[in-house]
């Protein structure tokens, strides 16, 4: 419908009366699908007499890019950045803003975890530098929606003892050069060298790929391994210097890094928060 209106000459910068949102704002606020934002931008490219202010802020001060980041839509983030969204004035959304995009049942959720990591990856690839406040917002999302993995989640049932599941994991490709089986056996510090978070996000969106694991009762364990492993580097890198400060720099950074490698993400989160409280 929006595409038809734009083709008929509707002003793409005109805000909807009841929402104070332009069509682009409305798309980005109400959908997480890449093609919806892409439709608007495609029409603007075809009809050069119409000018779209892609960096326009709505009455709440939000740009379309800030909307789709809060909706955990990395595909749409990339579409907007490809078409001129300005990162120099980008404001990372506050924690409550993510409520629009995070629909959680209060447990480990591979879609939310991969969405958070993929959005951050998209922003950083284009030059955005996360602040400590941004990192804390992301960690708080993990805590708020109970995305942290417990050690018990990683232990039972043991999928590696199940021949059919192991065979499936070897055949299931996460990327052109990496199988699910190989990914599950990588160390956390090796993961980001072999797979992008965008690839992880696309895998998480596929309802069919985890169906075999679900039927055999191994989905929860495998998902726990993936979520903990792929988000580990984010938590570890942000906790390294705060932990160093907490111990008053009594160990070299290399030693601190070795210690943190053995911690769970939830432990790293609490360390990060504690360090922030003591420094304030």
Explain the meaning of each model-derived region.
Residues 1-280:
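Ankyrin repeat (ANK) tandem arrays and their immediately adjacent linkers/low-complexity segments
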């Amino acid at each position: 419908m929006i595409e038809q209106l734009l083709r008929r000459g509707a002003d793409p910068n005109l805000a909807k009366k009841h929402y104070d949102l332009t069509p682009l704002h409305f798309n980005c606020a109400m959908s997480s699908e890449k093609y919806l934002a892409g439709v608007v931008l495609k029409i603007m490219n075809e009809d050069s007499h119409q000018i779209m202010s892609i960096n326009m802020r709505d009455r709440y001060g939000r740009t379309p890019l800030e909307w789709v980041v809060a909706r955990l839509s990395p595909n749409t983030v990339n579409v907007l950045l490809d078409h001129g969204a300005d990162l120099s004035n980008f404001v990372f959304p506050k924690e409550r803003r993510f409520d629009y995009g995070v629909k959680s049942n209060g447990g480990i959720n591979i879609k939310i975890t991969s969405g958070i990591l993929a959005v951050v990856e998209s922003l950083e690839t284009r030059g955005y530098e996360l602040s400590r406040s941004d990192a804390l917002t992301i960690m708080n999302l993990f805590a708020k929606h109970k995305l942290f993995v417990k050690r018990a989640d990683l232990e039972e049932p043991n999928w590696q003892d199940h021949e059919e599941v192991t065979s499936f994991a070897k055949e299931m490709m996460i990327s052109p050069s990496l199988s699910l089986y190989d990914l599950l056996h990588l160390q956390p510090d090796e993961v980001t060298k072999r797979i992008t978070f965008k690839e992880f996000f696309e895998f998480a969106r596929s309802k069919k790929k985890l169906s075999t694991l679900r039927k055999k009762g191994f989905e929860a364990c495998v998902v726990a391994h993936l979520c903990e492993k792929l988000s580990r580097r984010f938590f570890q890198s942000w906790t390294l210097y705060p932990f160093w400060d907490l111990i008053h720099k009594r160990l070299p950074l290399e030693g601190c890094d070795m210690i943190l490698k053995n911690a769970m993400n939830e432990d790293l989160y609490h360390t990060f928060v504690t360090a922030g409280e003591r420094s304030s």
